[in-house]
Amino acid sequence: MKVVLQRVSEASVDVVNELGTLDPTFEPQQIGPGFMILVGVTDGDGDKQIAWLAHKILNLRVFEDAQGKMNRSIQDIGGEILSISQFTLFADVHKGNRPSFIKAGKPEHADLMWIKFNEALRSGGVPVKEGRFGAHMRVGLVNDGPVTIVIDTEHDMPDGTR
């Protein structure tokens, strides 16, 4: 799994239908202070990656304490998460000018892993709002910092836990 995590003061998502207008079947989602997370899944991802990544995100100390030092987690500040499924995080641009997405997980697997990941975050007591898997979305956010962190379980998880 790969995530791009951004600390935000607010973020929102809505879904656009094939006519280019807002999809009335999707209720726009918005959060206040917390994280907007783009989430990419590969076919090799499973419960171990989900558990490790959710724990890492829930405990990541990137919010300032009273002294202005990054020393507080999203749980500490009572923050929220906006989770957006994003297969393009696994784009391969080595050859030609059109990215290849063959490293991204198959939709059925990726959707299930994304759902499980969001539930793992919720189990940490943090409210999680979601976009819609596979949809054309408009995501808005106000970066706080900015603080942007990329976490890739393939490279960042300790070897014994993969």
UniProtKB/Swiss-Prot annotation:
GO MF terms, alphabetically ordered: D-tyrosyl-tRNA(Tyr) deacylase activity; Gly-tRNA(Ala) deacylase activity; Ser(Gly)-tRNA(Ala) hydrolase activity; tRNA binding
Pfam families: Tyr_Deacylase
GO biological process, one term: D-amino acid catabolic process
Subcellular localization, as worded in the UniProt entry: Cytoplasm
Enzyme Commission number(s): 3.1.1.96
InterPro entries: Daa-tRNA_deacyls_DTD (IPR003732), DTD-like_sf (IPR023509)
EC top class, as a word: hydrolase
Any single Gene Ontology cellular-component annotation: cytoplasm
Motif Gly-cisPro motif, important for rejection of L-amino acids per record, residues: 145-146
Catalytic activity: glycyl-tRNA(Ala) + H2O = tRNA(Ala) + glycine + H(+); a D-aminoacyl-tRNA + H2O = a tRNA + a D-alpha-amino acid + H(+)
Record family assignment: Belongs to the DTD family.
Domain notes: A Gly-cisPro motif from one monomer fits into the active site of the other monomer to allow specific chiral rejection of L-amino acids.
HAMAP family: Deacylase_Dtd
UniProt-listed NCBIfam families: D-aminoacyl-tRNA deacylase
Known role: An aminoacyl-tRNA editing enzyme that deacylates mischarged D-aminoacyl-tRNAs. Also deacylates mischarged glycyl-tRNA(Ala), protecting cells against glycine mischarging by AlaRS. Acts via tRNA-based rather than protein-based catalysis; rejects L-amino acids rather than detecting D-amino acids in the active site. By recycling D-aminoacyl-tRNA to D-amino acids and free tRNA molecules, this enzyme counteracts the toxicity associated with the formation of D-aminoacyl-tRNA entities in vivo and helps enforce protein L-homochirality.
Protein name: D-aminoacyl-tRNA deacylase
